[in-house]
Amino acid sequence: MGSERIMTTQQQFLDLLSDIEPSTTTVNDCSSAHNTLRDALKVHNEFSKVHVHTFLSGSYKRNTAVRPTTIGGITQRPDVDIIALTNHTINDDPQIVLDAVHTALKDIGYTDLTVNRRSVNVKLKKVDMDVVPIISDGYGGYLIPDIHLEEWLVTNPPAHTEWTVEVNKNANGRFKPLVKLFKWWRRENLSDLKRPKGFILECLVAKHMNYYESNYEKLFVYLLETIRDSYGIYASLGIIPHLEDPGVAGNNVFSAVTADEFKTFFEKVEEQAAIARNALNETDDDKALALWRQVLGNRFPRSASHKSANSADMASSLIRSALGAGLTFPSTPVYPNKPGGFA
């Protein structure tokens, strides 16, 4: 019974992972949007003078994004990060560089624009894009403008992408799926919390996941419990832990997280770790399903045994209806195309 439930639950997690992947439509929308913008920047009559090249960053590039959520019947837009390497120098004022990006985008025809601290946000009907200008530091690294601090800061977007690939390889391909589960968990449980999110969650998973476990149920429980056991003292004292930025030595990925945000995040992890542990120990499929849905939401699927029973009933009903209507069936099975992930 125990081994059967482990296999069943592993399939439930794999089914959930398939379900929370960005759809082919979403991927195509993102691809079309970022390519159009990047091509336009490259040939813009003014920006082309400072343009060196552009590349993608963020969860879209790292293949750690989950499907856009729907709030109040409205599907939220996916985020795409576009890095624009320019030939500006450290002597150029950060505001001037961001203004140059903003002016070019406005001139190209984008209307819903917001100049943020380190980027220009572009809102389209189906996609949000952040255009982030960076410059070379002259030594193989990069600098990013910060208009609040009015200075250039060390950054390294390509290193984050390379790091993600390496960590996923070390985890036998299970790092990125676990990140997606953790991001989905956060959305289900802490959707109103501003931070931690995104890349911070990826760093937490990399630091605290079990690299030798292959079962996703156990991986997820272990992740929550290890985060709970590692950061209780920080939450109780109201201080922010240091989690090293894998791209920039000495940087703390938690630096923008407030003490209150971290405490809220920690308390939810603590609460949910207990529920997840109970779900792992539960031998009754229905009770385990109810517990996992408390943790990962109502999209968490039923076990294969439940689905196969329901499918058999449905298939029988459909066949009876089809025969009654005089329909014919194809001689070979037709398989649906599974949605691909972000690339």
From Swiss-Prot:
One of the protein's GO biological processes: defense response to virus
Record's note on what induces expression: Part of the CBASS operon consisting of cdnD-cap2-cap3-cap4.
Enzyme class: transferase
Cofactor: binding comment: Binds 1 Mg(2+) ion per subunit.
Family annotation (InterPro entries): NT_2-5OAS_ClassI-CCAase, NT_sf
Taxonomic superkingdom: Bacteria
Pfam families named in the record: SMODS
EC number: 2.7.7.-
Keyword entries, A-Z: Antiviral defense, ATP-binding, Magnesium, Metal-binding, Nucleotide metabolism, Nucleotide-binding, Nucleotidyltransferase, Transferase
Family per similarity comment: Belongs to the CD-NTase family. D01 subfamily.
Protein name, per record: Cyclic AMP-AMP-AMP synthase
Source organism: Acinetobacter sp. (strain ATCC 27244 / 9458)
Lineage start: Bacteria, Pseudomonadati, Pseudomonadota, Gammaproteobacteria, Moraxellales
Encoding gene per record: cdnD01
